[in-house]
Swiss-Prot record:
This protein's pathway: Purine metabolism; IMP biosynthesis via de novo pathway; 5-amino-1-(5-phospho-D-ribosyl)imidazole from N(2)-formyl-N(1)-(5-phospho-D-ribosyl)glycinamide: step 1/2
Any single Gene Ontology cellular-component annotation: cytoplasm
Pfam families assigned: GATase_5 (PF13507)
EC numbers on record: 6.3.5.3, 3.5.1.2
CDD domains: GATase1_FGAR_AT
Protein name: Phosphoribosylformylglycinamidine synthase subunit PurQ
Subcellular compartments: Cytoplasm
SUPFAM superfamilies associated with the record: Class I glutamine amidotransferase-like (SSF52317)
Catalytic activity: N(2)-formyl-N(1)-(5-phospho-beta-D-ribosyl)glycinamide + L-glutamine + ATP + H2O = 2-formamido-N(1)-(5-O-phospho-beta-D-ribosyl)acetamidine + L-glutamate + ADP + phosphate + H(+); L-glutamine + H2O = L-glutamate + NH4(+)
Keywords of this entry: ATP-binding, Cytoplasm, Glutamine amidotransferase, Hydrolase, Ligase, Nucleotide-binding, Purine biosynthesis
Disulfide linkage: none
Species of origin: Staphylococcus aureus (strain MRSA252)
Function, as annotated: Part of the phosphoribosylformylglycinamidine synthase complex involved in the purines biosynthetic pathway. Catalyzes the ATP-dependent conversion of formylglycinamide ribonucleotide (FGAR) and glutamine to yield formylglycinamidine ribonucleotide (FGAM) and glutamate. The FGAM synthase complex is composed of three subunits. PurQ produces an ammonia molecule by converting glutamine to glutamate. PurL transfers the ammonia molecule to FGAR to form FGAM in an ATP-dependent manner.
C-alpha cells in the first residue's frame, strides 16, 4: 500500500502524516499540490496546516488546486482518503464531506490535547478501536466548529457517519462532532490530529490504531 501525502503552501503536518504512514508499515510519498496524477497511489492523506495562508477561508484556495481532481477520482474509486484539520476543511470545500468548519465559538486558536469518544468503530478508520473507547488526540485550530444543517445532521446520524465526538467540546461543534465519514465510508475528515498521537513519550499514542486500521482494511480487500 502506498499513500500520497499532499503538500500545499502552508501545510505544516505533512511530515507527521508521512511518519504515521511509515509507522503503519506502508509506503508514502509527498505529492505537490500542482501534481495532476495520483496514479500508483492507494490512498490519500491531506494534512493540517494553513494551506495558502487560509486566505478567503480555510481550504478554499486549496480546493481548486490541480491535484484535487485526482483526489476526487480516488475517492470515487473507493480508495481511502483522510483529511485532518485543514485537510478536513478542504474535504468539505470540495464536497467530499458534508457541512463546513466555522470559527471556534471562543474566537481563539485552541492548541491542546482533547479527550474524544469513538462513536462508530465499524469504519475503515476506526475498526481497531472499541465502540465507546476514549482516546486522546491533540487539537490545534481556530476554525474547528463543525456546522451542518439539521437535514444533513439527521442524514449523518441515520447513516452512522459520525465516528468521533469531543468529550468536552472545545469549539462549539454541532453535537460535539469531531470526525465524520462519507456515505461510502472511504473518506474521513476530523479536526483532531491522530498523526500527532503516535508516541506515549509525546503524551499519547491513541492515533496509532487509526492508521493501522486504514492499512488493515485495505489489505483485507487487496491482499
Amino acid at each position: 500500500m502506498k499513500f500520497a501525502v499532499l503538500v500545499f503552501p502552508g501545510s505544516n503536518c505533512d511530515r507527521d502524516m508521512f511518519n504515521a504512514a511509515i509507522k503503519s508499515g506502508v509506503e508514502a510519498e509527498y505529492v505537490d499540490y500542482r501534481e495532476t496524477s495520483l496514479s500508483g497511489f492507494d490512498g490519500v492523506l491531506i494534512p493540517g496546516g494553513f494551506s495558502f495562508g487560509d486566505y478567503l477561508r480555510s481550504g478554499a484556495m486549496a480546493s481548486v488546486a490541480p491535484v484535487i481532481s485526482e483526489v476526487k477520482r480516488l475517492a470515487a474509486e473507493g480508495k481511502p482518503v483522510l483529511g485532518v484539520c485543514n485537510g478536513f476543511q478542504i474535504l468539505t470545500e470540495i464536497g467530499l464531506l458534508p457541512g463546513a468548519l466555522l470559527h471556534n465559538d471562543s474566537h481563539l486558536f485552541i492548541s491542546r490535547n482533547e479527550e474524544l469518544e469513538i462513536v462508530n468503530n465499524q469504519t475503515a478508520f476506526t475498526n481497531l478501536y472499541e465502540q465507546g473507547e476514549k482516546v486522546i488526540y491533540p487539537v490545534a485550530h481556530g476554525e474547528g466548529h463543525y456546522y451542518c444543517t439539521d437535514e444533513i445532521y439527521q442524514k449523518l446520524k441515520a447513516n452512522n457517519q459520525i465516528i468521533l465526538k469531543y468529550v468536552n467540546n472545545p469549539n462549539g461543534s454541532y453535537d460535539d462532532i469531531a470526525g465524520i465519514v462519507n456515505e461510502k465510508g472511504n473518506v474521513c475528515g476530523m479536526m483532531p490530529h491522530p498523526e500527532r498521537a503516535l508516541e506515549t513519550l509525546l503524551g499519547t499514542d491513541s492515533g496509532v490504531k487509526l492508521f493501522e486500521a486504514m492499512v488493515k482494511s485495505w489489505r483485507e480487500q487487496h491482499v
